Regions:
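Active-site-flanking beta-strand signature of metal-NTP-handling nucleotidyl enzymes
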Residues: 4-12, 55
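Hydrophobic/aromatic beta-strand elements that line small-molecule binding cavities or substrate pockets
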Residues: 9, 42-45
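Short, low-order "capping/linker" segments at domain edges
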Residues: 94-98
């Protein structure tokens, strides 16, 4: 089942952390991890003006995979997570009728 989720990832301080993380996320390795969790073409990103954090709205098809990735336990992503990520929060999104 597909679920809409929101992720807020805060970066560790340091020069080039955002660029390094985004470079990995767009690499073949990063894209493989992302595709195993969510529909990449439906991802909506947003970046803080100072690049200290990034937000993603995701269409998740593998919630357990997202939890593994967000907790830093995905074996493929662990090195970049350990180097770049300070904290991650994940929320489920619900539509509101207006």
């Amino acid at each position: 089942m597909e679920k809409e989720m929101f992720v807020l990832a805060k970066f560790k301080s340091g020069e080039g952390t955002f660029e390094k993380f985004m470079g990995w996320m767009q690499s073949d390795e990063g894209m493989g991890v992302r595709k195993s969790i969510a529909h990449v073409e439906k991802t909506v990103p947003a970046v803080a003006p100072d690049k200290s954090y990034i937000m993603f709205k995701l269409s998740v098809h593998n919630e357990e995979g997202l939890k593994e990735l967000a907790s830093g336990n995905n074996p493929i992503a662990k090195p970049i997570w350990d180097e770049c990520i300070e904290s991650i929060n994940v929320w489920e999104l619900n539509s509101v009728d207006i």
